[in-house]
């Protein structure tokens, strides 16, 4: 709902209200939070009284007439507001003040066209402002969606001289009260490290300058009340539909107002706005919940699933993937791929992805990026031949590309060295992963990518694309932004005409996990780190703002290439169940019992896929220190408990399941899991009638053919009992093997299926 009445603007959705008003030509922010009425506007208005003694007055005569103490929807420079400004400009090489005043507004049924991704299905309020002295017009666009609001800005040069934009944010938001800023930063294979910082008088900033949204600083962040929990408390969520360098800041004023800015990074930014030209910012998205972090996550998950990802993939089940990379890397033949395909099909996979190494002379990562012609020595039947053979097995066919990059050792670079991004002063090129970036600001480069990639997609039965990008940019400021606009143009032209293709984006893992890419790609590779212990943290952090339906989650071999850690196959599978399940290891090396375990994982996933991809996600902890993930639909609940290091003599552990009807009966059943005989080592001597060498042939043979039951549990209880906490099967306590106990040791986990007991089943 958008209500405009007597200078008051009220945006309201199913969860929250957003109110502001026109005051003396400025836009005064009134309220963003719990649902309210338009008539409440006067109650929310700031009351500065006699003002503060050091105020710079906008008009002489009233100490309260000072922009520095008011909550504002937008603020300029040099007119008395000394807080951080969302806009910085220069004209003729000199910084200039800005002073935008209200002109009018209109309600639009749909967003105006944009070169940037814009949320789907929103109603728009357009508010028009003007700086008469600078001859500039500013349009603030507000969008209303069922669980979120959006904001962006469009600046138009109405004068006769060029204006240089040094900084132009997407949104300026002001909130009263005390808040903690929750951010998610990190690096390669260490993405999404959750940090909590109190918002104080000192400004807190988080910024990416790499040319991508980056694993260093995810664009999504939260503002939460200090006492907020998973189920209760005020929490705000913010994100940005942008895949380039970005910026956020939060700072509390002496008056108790927290100003939040979000938008394109201003670092080295200088965008020339010619007379008559317009500059548009990326769209910011924000949501509020009074039901804690879980409520806020539900708002954002619904937003992403229903208003962000491509319409053809909204609500569609994601296939179980087998990716060839860790099983083959660059060393493969068609016959080897087909062997892997047969193994993948037998284990329950539905889509075979040929990763790197299929084009040019790509036998290492030092060559051939940009040369997207099939290597016929490896694939004598071409991509079509391979794809048709995989289709005949009952597998879909997917393909990996890295289109934004070029190898210096490639035919493309030798023919068009000017197509790469180079230093503007001609300095020596800096390589990342042995490659350069193509200059996507050039139309001819974009045309080449659209034609070459599009031609391959049309010439073979390809139903999935993994789009990778593996280096940071050396471009600066405005050139970085122009590159992102070029990327979006390429993605639009390739994939909008081919909506049947499932696109998964990737950038050295989670280096570009953002809402801008989700507008094109329904799922994103979370991280190059597939160690489930690390993935548990990464995926939990992602879950605050992104739904599991867009997580690329694969089971890999142990010990893990990123950590050298040994983890159980059960835990690798259990973590990967909560997302878009896939496998990335050499399937031909699996033991028979491992094959059986993977088949059980894929069977469980297919049976509960809708819940695991689209259910309501809740985070929790057990009293035994376990991490709890819960996915719930109206029909069923899937919950998992994950542990770190095994303690000595662990106590009782209780699982609390939320969202059930307290008066109904529910049955909990654990997903069957198995233990390796060899994991017990010399302890086998205490339970067997004969002494066996734990490293000997007998134990190795048993290990390859036999597994022991682990963590089996089944019980029936009321929803009220589940909410209070049901007691789980005991963990290993050093006193023997319990076939009904949980015996995993370090990094163990269990998954539980919970469903209402039908009336005829009740005792």
Predicted feature residues:
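Active-site neighborhood of glycoside hydrolase catalytic domains
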Residues: 375-382, 414-570, 577-595
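Extended acidic/polar, glycine-enriched regions
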Residues: 146, 154, 162-163, 242-247, ...
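Carbohydrate-binding surface patches
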Residues: 222, 622-663
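Conserved, mostly hydrophobic/aromatic
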Residues: 15, 153, 276, 322, ...
